[in-house]
């Protein structure tokens, strides 16, 4: 880590102790100072996202689901770290990941070199995915398949489908047509895979599109479409995450068939026990180095690839580079704090709450409580901020961030409710996924193309680390309490969360389309002769 810190210091020219400030150092100082007002704005957004979740959990803890002081204190400290982490990450992604992706995407399109686009696209998808921290967790859940085999296969799947996404945008291939083909292949393969691996396979699609990969991949799409001048360019600026989510699902399903895997394993999170405030801080500080290393490993491939592009083709000015460098530091700090708080503070609390609620006689309360938590928790997903902002910018405000957030919240709320039904009843996940995807793909042929692309991107974005570190442990804890099968009944929450936004966002688009048609039909037809009669003579002559 000391080497990584030294490289950042040298790249940003942050003065070492005893050093003197140069022009570049003053530039970095100006950039940092100019970002402080934005940090305050992001802090308010983070508070609005996390405080409702904290309030719901506190109400449960002080009423029907009592927890130990250790779990409660860990949860509260974790919530504070998540708030600060979201604040830094959202600003950092705006300053670094988004402009980096847009410039690389534009450069690839301008080159008009198909082999370069295919090669770089695959390499980007492969390297970004192989360093995704959540992929390591997924690999440990499938012990019958060697970890490195699974990781390399999933990364290759993302790389291949990122190339397909690029080619789709350049060739103008409709997204619904590709979705029909790929999801038909997925459900065909699912018929030959052991049921123990179905949920894990579908979860992999949401797990691998994490907060590190989503902002960069989405920005690549905007950069590629920005070079096109046709009227469908804005529609095709989304859809990269949608196709990248298909690759991991296919990879895990194929590996499940090849390796004849028969079962998966589940290791419940360790319930923390702390005696005082020093032990509480020690618990978090011991986990901090793990996430410092993980996020550094995740950021490094993106930084290296961008550095190569900068030297070879981009040649961005010094001020913009300084802003990107400061943004990368913010992104790094934000993700480290976020993942530390989520994994050490939220995960044990979610698991224990699930056990307490599932162990009560009125266990049906899991369904409405899960829906309430799901409605608010998606607002705390780091990548959701990036998606909502990008949607608002690309559509020139036609789809506001608030409208997009409401559609995502409704979708995730529904998905968590259905996931809790699965936990309580043991219904196969295919009974939900097949009708859900069939409906989502069917309406994609009548909904405006832009909404379809946004919807399928939103599915990968909504199923982020908050789902994996709180909603999934909540379902696992409840499954333990009711005596269910963890692997078949609890896993699959991520897949459910990734599916329902496809429906809610497209329905939002359908409603908007119907309103537009109704407004146009309600407008009275104007008589040209009457309009001319109302104009003064000078205006008619000018016309």
What is the role of each PLM region?
Residues 72-77, 270-383:
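Transmembrane helical segments that form the transport core of multi-pass membrane transport proteins
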Residues 2-46, 50, 101-115, 229-237, ...:
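Intrinsically disordered, low-complexity non-transmembrane regions of multi-pass membrane transporters
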Residues 59-73, 93-102, 127-142, 161-173, ...:
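Transmembrane helix-loop junctions in multi-pass membrane proteins
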């Amino acid at each position: 880590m000391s080497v990584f810190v030294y490289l950042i210091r040298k790249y940003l020219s942050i003065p070492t102790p005893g050093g003197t400030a140069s022009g570049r150092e003053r530039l970095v100082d100006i950039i940092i100072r100019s970002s402080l007002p934005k940090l305050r704005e992001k802090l308010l957004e983070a508070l609005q996202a996390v405080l409702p979740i904290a309030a719901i959990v506190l109400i449960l803890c002080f009423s029907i689901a009592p927890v130990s002081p250790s779990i409660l204190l860990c949860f509260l400290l974790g919530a504070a770290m998540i708030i600060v982490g979201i604040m830094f990450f959202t600003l950092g992604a705006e300053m670094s990941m988004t402009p980096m992706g847009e410039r690389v995407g534009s450069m690839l399109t301008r080159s008009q070199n198909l082999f370069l686009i295919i090669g770089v696209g695959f390499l980007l998808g492969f390297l970004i995915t192989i360093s995704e921290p959540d992929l390591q967790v997924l690999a440990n859940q499938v012990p019958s398949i060697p970890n490195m085999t699974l990781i390399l296969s999933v990364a290759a799947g993302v790389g291949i489908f990122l190339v397909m996404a690029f080619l789709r945008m350049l060739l103008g291939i409709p997204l619904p047509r590709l979705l029909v083909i790929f999801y038909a292949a997925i459900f065909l393969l699912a018929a030959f895979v052991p049921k123990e691996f179905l949920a894990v396979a579908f979860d992999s699609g949401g797990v691998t599109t994490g907060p590190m990969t989503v902002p960069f991949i989405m920005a690549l799409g905007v950069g590629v479409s920005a070079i096109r001048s046709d009227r469908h360019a804005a529609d095709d600026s989304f859809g990269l995450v949608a196709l990248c989510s298909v690759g991991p699902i296919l990879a895990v399903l194929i590996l499940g068939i090849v390796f004849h895997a028969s079962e998966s394993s589940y290791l419940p999170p360790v319930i923390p026990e702390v005696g005082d405030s020093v032990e509480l801080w020690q618990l978090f500080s011991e986990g901090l180095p793990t996430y410092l290393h993980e996020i550094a490993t995740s950021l490094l491939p993106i930084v290296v690839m961008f550095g190569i592009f900068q030297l070879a083709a981009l040649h961005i000015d010094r001020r913009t580079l300084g802003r990107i460098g400061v943004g990368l530091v913010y992104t790094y700090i934000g993700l480290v704090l976020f993942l530390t708080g989520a994994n050490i503070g939220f995960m044990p609390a979610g698991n224990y709450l699930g056990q307490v609620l599932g162990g009560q006689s009125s266990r049906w309360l899991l369904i409405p409580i899960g829906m309430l938590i799901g409605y608010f928790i998606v607002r705390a997903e780091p990548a959701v901020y990036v998606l909502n902002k990008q949607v608002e910018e690309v559509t020139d405000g036609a789809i506001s961030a608030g409208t997009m957030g409401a559609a995502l919240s409704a979708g995730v709320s529904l998905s968590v409710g259905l996931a809790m039904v699965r936990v309580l009843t043991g219904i196969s996940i295919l009974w939900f996924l097949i009708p859900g995807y069939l409906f989502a793909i069917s309406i994609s042929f009548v909904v405006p193309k832009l909404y379809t692309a946004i919807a399928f991107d939103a599915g990968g974005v909504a199923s982020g680390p908050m789902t994996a570190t709180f909603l999934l442990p909540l379902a696992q804890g409840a499954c333990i309490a009711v005596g269910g099968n963890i692997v078949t009944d609890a896993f699959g929450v991520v897949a459910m969360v990734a599916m329902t936004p496809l429906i809610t966002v497209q329905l939002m688009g359908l409603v908007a389309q119907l309103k537009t048609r109704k407004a146009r039909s309600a407008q009275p037809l104007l008589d040209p002769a009457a309009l001319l009669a109302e104009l003064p003579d000078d205006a008619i002559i000018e016309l």
